[in-house]
């Protein structure tokens, strides 16, 4: 049985519920969703692309990724948004991301 397709609204609802916890535990100042979920093109095989604004800390980002993967029951990519990042990815995030 394929995993359920999670809608953008479902993802954002969970992120809203977890926002204070995520800000405190992971030092995240902003969190949102982008990619296929934000475009309404997610399939059962799609991962969830999450964008965060936070200080560079690979350990905290890895822990956040693990927590969200467990919460959503599917692979999650956590991308740290910053001024000096891949310009194509930055443009995609700028166009697609919806934040809580």
Segments predicted by a language model, with ranges:
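Catalytic core of pol beta-like nucleotidyltransferases
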Residues: 1-30, 38-44, 54-100
């Amino acid at each position: 049985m394929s995993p359920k397709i999670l809608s953008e609204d479902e993802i954002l609802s969970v992120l809203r519920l977890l926002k204070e916890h995520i800000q405190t535990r992971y030092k995240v100042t902003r969190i949102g969703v982008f990619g296929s979920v934000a475009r309404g093109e997610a399939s059962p095989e799609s991962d969830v692309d999450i964008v965060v604004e936070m200080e560079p800390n690979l350990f905290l980002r890895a822990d956040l990724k693990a927590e969200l993967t467990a919460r959503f029951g599917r692979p999650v990519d956590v991308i740290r948004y910053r001024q000096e990042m891949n310009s194509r990815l930055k443009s995609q995030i700028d166009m697609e991301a919806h934040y809580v």
